[in-house]
Amino acid sequence: MERIKELRNLMSQSRTREILTKTTVDHMAIIKKYTSGRQEKNPSLRMKWMMAMKYPITADKRITEMVPERNEQGQTLWSKMSDAGSDRVMVSPLAVTWWNRNGPVTNTVHYPKVYKTYFDKVERLKHGTFGPVHFRNQVKIRRRVDINPGHADLSAKEAQDVIMEVVFPNEVGARILTSESQLTITKEKKEELRDCKISPLMVAYMLERELVRKTRFLPVAGGTSSIYIEVLHLTQGTCWEQMYTPGGEVRNDDVDQSLIIAARNIVRRAAVSADPLASLLEMCHSTQIGGTRMVDILRQNPTEEQAVDICKAAMGLRISSSFSFGGFTFKRTSGSSVKREEEVLTGNLQTLKIRVHEGYEEFTMVGKRATAILRKATRRLVQLIVSGRDEQSIAEAIIVAMVFSQEDCMIKAVRGDLNFVNRANQRLNPMHQLLRHFQKDAKVLFQNWGIEHIDSVMGMVGVLPDMTPSTEMSMRGIRVSKMGVDEYSSTERVVVSIDRFLRVRDQRGNVLLSPEEVSETQGTERLTITYSSSMMWEINGPESVLVNTYQWVIRNWETVKIQWSQNPAILYNKMEFEPFQSLVPKAIRGQYSGFVRTLFQQMRDVLGTFDTTQIIKLLPFAAAPPKQSRMQFSSLTVNVRGSGMRILVRGNSPVFNYNKTTKRLTILGKDAGTLIEDPDESTSGVESAVLRGFLILGKEDRRYGPALSINELSNLAKGEKANVLIGQGDVVLVMKRKRDSSILTDSQTATKRIRMAIN
């Protein structure tokens, strides 16, 4: 108050006022501060001061021909004095108003195209719904978020090339448009912006918004997709939040969401196959998301999620250096440790071999619904400050931190045996064993942890073993805070390696990610995901496996047929038959396989028993490792529709039905494609007779006597010719080969020759 009185007193003296208003600022340092560099030092003052002038704007001389000197009210719009230091005219803000009302109207067709991102935003806001405002403490954490809805995912360099090509096509400079998305966008934009009068620089700026992902590190409580971030200032303050439902989705958010779902499905599936890494790569390369190849999206999309990062690592791309455990992203902020193998005993006296981290370290832990700061020493939790949306989320974070600390009291809290397995039925590593155990039930863990008296600290409370808050007591070293912990802000990416079991390590050998860390959450993708790989057939259930397996055989029948007769071992090992095995009851799989393989061998050995439909029908069963047994089957069981259904070895069934007249195959009533049997094999099986060591010479030749039946052929000597009756009474001339030539050429040419001979 005293100061203010003193100031008022000073201001009332005219001398003070005079000094302040009339004195020139001639101190060199001040002049330097406000005049050096292009950056405006006090923009709001500059704006106010400029607008107080009569002519704050300068314009090209041509303005004098296009805008009158005075408006209807007689106010001067521009000055006859030219601007000091340039040959431009000084203009009043009133000229802008005049121009807006009376200036020429141009064609507006390009505006929605150039300013697409703005028009789209208006639409989203128009159709969005704003709900009530709630006043409550906001736990915000800084996360790296996408602030630019509706963009493609080009790199800055790729976008630059596209923009140059679209906006300045005649500029000199090498531009290489390689990726599919670059070419498509360039073509589309050139088309849209033909004869566009909007300033090229503006067009370039707006194109950049459409092509490149822009991210900022912002405090967020709630949705992090770009359509929520664009209204962040409307939906959350320091102590309030407003409910909001966006009025429309944007492709970039859909891509991010669908990519995560595809990656999770692929990692889960790869983990249970014989060679997880090879399978994962095969699936990533053969999958499309919203019509774009998944590998292209992975190269461009910066989404950080466990499954996505495993796929990136497999492709040799760099990923973030933080590591994942129990669904939380850990980032070491200080300290260091060395690893040592140690054997520990659980409360059930089971021995576990764990890799102990020796040394003091500090970490930030960031999860979907909780965040924490963890300080730990060798096998000891020093302090955990956790914050989360609700009791459940906070408990999850505490369990993960307790297990991660490797404390003895945690290991001793194990009751019962640890024998958790992953999807491939392999035992989990000890740390994940412990994690799974306590995620199921943490009661003993919390009870045994220990309790301590606490000092009251602003914004922090204690938490008891039953998860109730307390200001007096807390579980040892653990506090709940109102403030969230920021996500790791750096976008630095590191080179990593991946082993065949999909464990991702940094260059010091620390495991950053493994399939155990991939979330089991199921979601529905917003863009269509097309998995072309046979390994993903089972994602839509047993029926899809059945239909896809048979469709694959039919599509590839020509090659399958040759392999069937020449080199069945390779055929039986095809990965396309792998999913089918899960449909065959485990106990009988081996017997079925042995039975079918024997049957096929007889078909190969006995002339005239080749039967396309039967081979296709039974082939998938032969892929399992065979058990030798004398058992004969008239039908084989597959588990679909929740129960065992039968496939008849000879004849049709609801599962596998071949209609001879229409040549259509239906699986469980679903059309599985057209199956062309080889000419009339069903009646005589000539194909196998002819294939095995006979050459078809052409039409019947009477000089070689009456037509023999297929069974009589075996009596011919090498090089001898004879007429043979095939199928529907057609007769062809054949010769028994002089040498046992390759069946391959026989099987390829026989069918064609029979057809030619008959026709």
Curated annotation (Swiss-Prot):
SUPFAM superfamilies: PB2 C-terminal domain-like (SSF160453). Plays an essential role in transcription initiation and cap-stealing mechanism, in which cellular capped pre-mRNAs are used to generate primers for viral transcription. Recognizes and binds the 7-methylguanosine-containing cap of the target pre-RNA which is subsequently cleaved after 10-13 nucleotides by the viral protein PA. Plays a role in the initiation of the viral genome replication and modulates the activity of the ribonucleoprotein (RNP) complex. A motif (Nuclear localization signal) lies at residues 736-739. Keywords: Cap snatching, Eukaryotic host gene expression shutoff by virus, Eukaryotic host transcription shutoff by virus, Host gene expression shutoff by virus, Host mitochondrion, Host nucleus, Host-virus interaction, Inhibition of host innate immune response by virus, Inhibition of host MAVS by virus, Inhibition of host RLR pathway by virus, Inhibition of host RNA polymerase II by virus, mRNA capping, mRNA processing, Viral immunoevasion, Viral transcription, Virion. Pfam families: Flu_PB2_1st (PF20947), Flu_PB2_2nd (PF20948), Flu_PB2_3rd (PF20949), Flu_PB2_4th (PF20950), Flu_PB2_5th (PF00604), Flu_PB2_6th (PF20951), Flu_PB2_7th (PF20952). Disulfide bonds: none annotated. It comes from Influenza A virus (strain A/Kitakyushu/159/1993 H3N2). This is Polymerase basic protein 2. Coiled coil: none annotated. Signal peptide: none annotated.
